[in-house]
Regions:
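Conserved SAM-binding loop of SAM-dependent methyltransferases across substrates and taxa
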Residues: 53-67
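Mobile active-site "lid"/loop adjacent to the S-adenosyl-L-methionine
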Residues: 125-168
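Short, glycine/acidic-enriched loop or turn micro-motifs at the edges of active sites
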Residues: 51, 76, 127
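Extended hydrophobic secondary-structure segments that form protein cores and membrane-embedded regions
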Residues: 11, 45-51, 98-100, 121-122
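S-adenosyl-L-methionine
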Residues: 72-123
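Conserved AdoMet
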Residues: 1-32
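Conserved class I S-adenosyl-L-methionine
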Residues: 39-53, 70
Length: 168
């Protein structure tokens, strides 16, 4: 199990089975370049862009495949939360490093160090381009579920703005 896995109030709580599916799919992709065998162990290194407050991808990747990770995020609270989870779990402490991205305009700059190499990068980007698009998606979902009775629809999910929407 994972000790101290707690997400700060108001942060995105990821559905773990779907996130595990992403990691297993990534493992299958890595196997294509490894004679059909999923690479295991600390020689495999991944970069999780937008690690979030939950650190879910590094947790699953380390547990299932013993991979090493760098997790980056533009949110200091998310990095603090993920770093705390890592520190409380010996199986993560030596193989996961959380780094704060000081510039929301950059993805790799300030995160990837000179001569640092990764076998893969992964990202679970925000689903919406704007708060308005997120609200429209919630309204559509409620209508499709037969709940359109004219009442005001709130978002059917939680999270910080940078977890939920971004331009592009």
């Amino acid at each position: 199990g994972v000790e101290g896995w707690d997400i700060p109030d108001g942060y995105l709580c990821p559905p773990i089975p779907g996130r595990a599916d992403y990691i297993h799919h990534l493992a299958d992709l890595l196997a294509f370049g490894n004679d059909g065998t999923i690479p295991l162990g600390h020689s495999v290194r991944g970069l999780d862009v937008g690690v979030g407050a939950s650190c879910v991808y590094p947790i699953v990747g380390c547990h299932e495949y013993r991979w090493r990770f760098v997790g980056s995020d533009i949110d200091a609270v998310a990095i603090e939360s993920s770093s705390r989870i890592v520190a409380l779990n010996p199986f993560l402490a030596e193989v996961v490093e959380c780094r704060l991205q000081p510039s929301s305009a950059d993805i790799f700059r300030n995160i990837i160090q000179p001569d640092e190499r990764f076998d893969f990068t992964l990202c679970n980007p925000p689903f919406h381009a704007s708060p308005q698009e997120a609200a429209a998606g919630s309204q559509r979902k409620f209508r499709n579920l037969g709940h359109s009775r004219g009442e005001k629809v709130v978002l059917n999910f939680g999270g910080q703005a940078n977890e939920l929407w971004c331009e592009g």
